[in-house]
Amino acid sequence: MKVKSLKRSSKKEIASLFDRWNKSLKSGDPDQVVKNYAKNSILLATLSNKPRLTVAEKKSYFKSFLINKPVGKINYRKIEVGYDTAFDAGIYTFTFARTGAVVKARYTFTYRFDGIKWFITSHHSSRMPEDK
C-alpha cells in the first residue's frame, strides 16, 4: 500500500493563490474563475445572499460579478499553512473598472492540495460594515 505524502506549503505559495484567483477575475471568464474552486467548495460571496455550492451557482455569480471588471488588492492578511491545507484571511479591496466603484471587504479563503494543485474549499467575503 502506497502512503500519500503530505504537502507542507509556504506562506508565499499560499499568497500566490490569491494572485492566481485575481488573474482569473481579470480574464473576464467565469469558467476560469470557477476552476480555482474545489468540486465540493462553498462560496459565500460579497454581493450575494445565496450560498453558492455547485459549479453552476458559482459560475452564475461570477458571470454577473465580472461584468464590472473587478480587480482585487489585499490590504491586510493572515496566512496559516498545514499539510495539504491552508487559509488566507484578511481585508481586500475591489476596484470595479467599469463603474469606478470601490468595495472594501473581509475575506477568508481555505485551500486544499489534491496532490497536484491547490483548490479553494471555502471562500467567504463580506463588505465592511463601516464602509456602507
Predicted feature locations:
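A solvent-exposed, acidic/Ser-Thr-rich amphipathic alpha-helical stretch
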Residues: K11-K12, L17, P30-G82, T99
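Hydrophobic/aromatic beta-strand elements that line small-molecule binding cavities or substrate pockets
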Residues: K58, F62, I74-E80, Y92-F94, ...
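Short beta-strand edge/turn micro-motifs at domain boundaries
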Residues: K104-K132
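Short, well-ordered beta-strand segments in beta-rich or mixed alpha/beta enzyme
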Residues: I42-T46, T85-F96, T110
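Short helix-adjacent coil turns
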Residues: W21, L25-D29
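A short, structured loop/turn motif at beta-sheet edges
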Residues: I79-A86, T99, R112-K117
